[in-house]
Regions:
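Acidic, low-complexity cytosolic segments
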Residues: 2-33, 40-160
C-alpha cells in the first residue's frame, strides 16, 4: 500500500530503500538519529535512536526553519541554502535539502564530529536524491490514502 505525502507517494519497497540508506548513513557517521521531513512539515521517516520529543511538532518546525532560511538566502542574493547547522552544548543538528522537496535532519552529539557528519551527509543526500527523484517521477496512484486529511486540526492543536 503506498504512503502518500503532499502530491507524491511511495511504496513499501521505496520506504525500505530509504530506511536502508538512512541506516547506512547513521552507521557511517555515528550520528544518533536521522529524520526525513517533507517541505510541508510532514514526518516521512525516522531511523536510529527514537526522539524523546514530539516528532510531529519537530517536523513542522524543521520545515518552517528551512523555509525561513531559504528566504534569508534570497535576501543576501543566494537562491537557497542547501544545508543548515545548529549547534548546542550537548546536541546538534544538521539539515540538508534532498531533491528540493525533502529535508534530511541529522541529530548528533559528541560521539561524532561535525566534519564526519558533513562528509557522510553528502553521500546520503546523493543516494536519497536518486531514490526520491524516481518516486517524484512516478505517477501517483489513484486511491492512495491521504495521510494529510485532518492535518490542519492536528497542527492547530500543537499551538494551543
Amino acid at each position: 500500500m503506498p504512503v502518500r505525502a503532499a502530491s507524491w507517494s511511495f511504496t513499501e519497497d521505496d520506504f525500505g530503500a530509504i530506511t536502508q540508506s538512512l541506516q547506512r548513513f547513521l552507521h557511517d557517521s555515528n550520528a544518533r538519529c536521522a529524520l526525513l521531513v517533507d517541505r510541508t512539515g510532514q514526518l516521512v521517516a525516522t531511523v536510529g535512536e527514537q526522539p524523546t520529543f514530539d516528532a510531529t511538532a519537530f517536523a513542522t518546525l524543521t520545515a518552517a526553519d528551512f523555509s525561513a532560511n531559504d528566504q534569508l538566502a534570497r535576501l543576501i542574493g543566494e537562491s537557497d541554502f542547501t544545508t543548515l547547522f545548529h549547534q548546542g552544548e550537548r546536541e546538534s543538528m544538521y539539515l540538508a535539502d534532498v531533491a528540493r522537496r525533502v529535508i534530511l535532519v541529522v541529530l548528533f552529539d559528541n560521539r561524532t564530529t561535525l566534519g564526519l557528519v558533513r562528509l557522510k551527509v553528502k553521500q546520503a543526500v546523493d543516494d536519497l536524491t536518486e531514490l526520491f527523484t524516481r518516486v517524484f517521477a512516478r505517477p501517483t496512484g489513484e486511491g492512495a490514502p491521504n495521510v494529510l486529511a485532518g492535518s490542519d486540526d492536528e497542527i492547530d492543536k500543537l499551538f494551543q
